[in-house]
């Protein structure tokens, strides 16, 4: 896709999201409406970013037990980050150093948290947090933020899918990310193909698989290989794109 077509699509998607926000009935929201809201916010953030020497974008999605919002806890925050090649070998974590290039390049603990853009955060009032909970309630997500205690297999590998509500959100974000890649929006923004990493602090198997699905042309292969090398996911857990 040409840069001009990519940017035109970028603008059209942004307008769809803004229209959805304006027309949405308060307290009730469908998956399609919430997806449009997420997409609109993601495009707004991308539009704000300067093109530098970025090598990857990260969609950081992490359930936070510390915050309570509208009576719920352990619901996911969503922030957008990027990292530049010029930052490699410059430790951005004041508490500990990376054990190697893989960790410094891909572990979110070594990405600059001075450069975070919120998509969903839980500081009241927050329209995106309200929309997330309205969507959960409208679609009947049960025990929002709760999680089963039976989440390890016989080899003590974590096989859970995160707290209730996270799989549903991750599915939408994966769909949006895949569309950004296949429609050429990321390439049009940065002038080159970049991986979009879906991540949490724990490098969970389901986040790694979501990243593989969201980057259908192998954009995130270097990240996937790093996760395999470090045992964050095994080959039998990894779901490859066909």
Question: Could you tell me what each predicted segment is?
Answer:
Residues 1-10:
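Bacterial N-terminal signal peptides that target proteins for export
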Residues 11-28:
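Bacterial Sec-dependent signal peptides at the C-terminal "C-region" and cleavage site
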Residues 25-61:
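Short N-terminal edge-element motif at the start of the domain
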Residues 29, 38, 81, 85, ...:
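Leucine-rich tandem repeat or coiled-coil scaffolds
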Residues 29-43, 159-180:
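Well-ordered, non-membrane alpha-helical segments in soluble/globular domains
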Residues 50-94:
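N-terminal interaction modules that seed assembly of large macromolecular complexes
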Residues 86-162:
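Low-complexity, serine/threonine/proline-enriched polar segments
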Residues 169, 175-242:
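Glycine-rich, aromatic-bearing surface loops/beta-hairpins
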């Amino acid at each position: 896709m040409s840069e001009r077509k990519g940017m035109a699509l970028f603008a059209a998607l942004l307008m769809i999201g803004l229209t959805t926000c304006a027309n949405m009935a308060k307290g009730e929201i469908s998956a399609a409406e919430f997806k449009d809201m997420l997409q609109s916010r993601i495009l707004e953030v991308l539009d704000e970013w300067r093109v530098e020497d970025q090598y990857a974008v990260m969609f950081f999605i992490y359930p936070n037990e510390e915050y309570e919002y509208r009576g719920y806890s352990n619901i996911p925050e969503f922030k957008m980050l990027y990292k530049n090649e010029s930052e490699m070998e410059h430790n951005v974590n004041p508490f500990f150093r990376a054990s190697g290039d893989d960790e410094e390049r891909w572990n979110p603990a070594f990405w600059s948290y001075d450069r975070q853009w919120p998509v969903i955060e839980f500081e009241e009032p927050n329209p995106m947090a309200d929309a997330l909970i309205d969507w959960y309630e409208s679609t009947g997500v049960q025990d929002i933020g709760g999680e089963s205690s039976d989440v390890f297999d016989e080899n003590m590998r974590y096989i859970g899918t995160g707290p209730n509500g996270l799989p549903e959100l991750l599915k939408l974000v994966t769909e949006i990310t895949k569309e950004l890649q296949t429609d050429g929006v990321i390439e049009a923004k940065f002038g080159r193909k970049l991986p979009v990493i879906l991540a949490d602090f724990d490098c969970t198997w389901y986040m790694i698989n979501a990243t593989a699905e969201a980057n259908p042309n192998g954009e995130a292969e270097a990240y996937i290989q790093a996760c395999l090398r470090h045992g964050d996911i095994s080959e039998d857990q990894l779901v490859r794109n066909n």
